[in-house]
Amino acid sequence: MSMTDPIADMLTRVRNAQRAEKAEVSMPSSKIKQAIANVLKEEGYIESFEVGGDEKKPELKISLRYYQGEPVIRELERASSPGLRLFKDKGSLPRVRNGLGVAIVSTSKGVMTDRAAREAGHGGEVLCYVF
């Protein structure tokens, strides 16, 4: 059975694992999921991630981060969906919680945060919001 929205599935798995206070979460891997995990790691929302398993069915394992027993990620919300894509140009990229959170954007130069996209002068598809 194929998944309709693999990015939403990834975000839901991370959100549920953090609520259950799990140390890590695993899911089927893809290039876009690895790029999102890389942005989350660079921004300090997760400890690390690794891709394992065999070549036909790679698996993405994400080590979650907690601070004083509380999850670092407070909110993890999907912005764009397969049925309703959300594209923004560089001037209208959203600021999440007045800059305290990040929006993860897929641009022509790769997946990056809203701040990095603004600095590079790129717009793109807003994938999700993290706070």
UniProtKB/Swiss-Prot annotation:
Q: Which residues form the signal peptide?
A: none
> So which domain of life are we looking at?
Bacteria
Gene Ontology cellular component list: ribonucleoprotein complex; ribosome
UniProt GO BP: translation
| InterPro entries according to UniProt | Ribosomal_uS8, Ribosomal_uS8_CS, Ribosomal_uS8_sf
> Which keywords label this protein?
Ribonucleoprotein, Ribosomal protein, RNA-binding, rRNA-binding
Q: Which SUPFAM superfamilies match?
A: Ribosomal protein S8
MF terms from GO for this chain are: rRNA binding; structural constituent of ribosome
Q: Check the record and name the PANTHER family matching this protein.
A: 40S RIBOSOMAL PROTEIN S15A (PTHR11758)
| Assembly, per entry | Part of the 30S ribosomal subunit. Contacts proteins S5 and S12.
Q: Which family does it belong to?
A: Belongs to the universal ribosomal protein uS8 family.
Function, please? Answer: One of the primary rRNA binding proteins, it binds directly to 16S rRNA central domain where it helps coordinate assembly of the platform of the 30S subunit.
Official protein name in the record: Small ribosomal subunit protein uS8
Which organism is this protein's natural source?
A: Alkalilimnicola ehrlichii (strain ATCC BAA-1101 / DSM 17681 / MLHE-1)
What gene does the UniProt entry assign to this protein?
rpsH
